[in-house]
């Protein structure tokens, strides 16, 4: 099987060969249950995190030198679009309410559900 991958080059030339995954890092996501009385504050925490992520991505995008490849800006724009997707912004709120789990865990559960679709 042949797979062709396109992207931004970091060095000159073409690389051909087998891919070896040395280490698969996973983000250490805190997973804990919350009380029903904490649902609103946990959803607010998620909303604030999404808002801050948008601000940070926009700030990064706005400071990219004009000489940089347009692909970099488009990469950031893609992430901004993901932060507008209800599947990643609203569904975790339902998970927080239904499962009484913290925001990070709810987002991880939703991410896994989307990946396994």
Which role fits each region the language model picked out?
Residues 1-117:
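Non-catalytic, soluble scaffold/interaction modules
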């Amino acid at each position: 099987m042949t797979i062709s991958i396109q992207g931004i080059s970091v060095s000159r030339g073409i690389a051909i060969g087998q891919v070896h995954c040395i280490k698969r890092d996973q983000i250490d996501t805190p997973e804990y249950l919350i009380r029903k009385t904490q649902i609103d504050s946990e959803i607010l925490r998620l909303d604030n995190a999404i808002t801050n992520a948008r601000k940070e991505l926009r700030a990064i995008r706005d400071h990219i030198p004009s000489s940089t490849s347009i692909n970099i800006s488009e990469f950031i724009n893609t992430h901004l679009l993901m932060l507008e997707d209800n599947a990643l912004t609203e569904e975790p709120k339902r998970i927080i309410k239904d499962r009484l789990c913290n925001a990070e865990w709810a987002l991880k559960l939703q991410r896994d559900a989307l990946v396994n679709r």
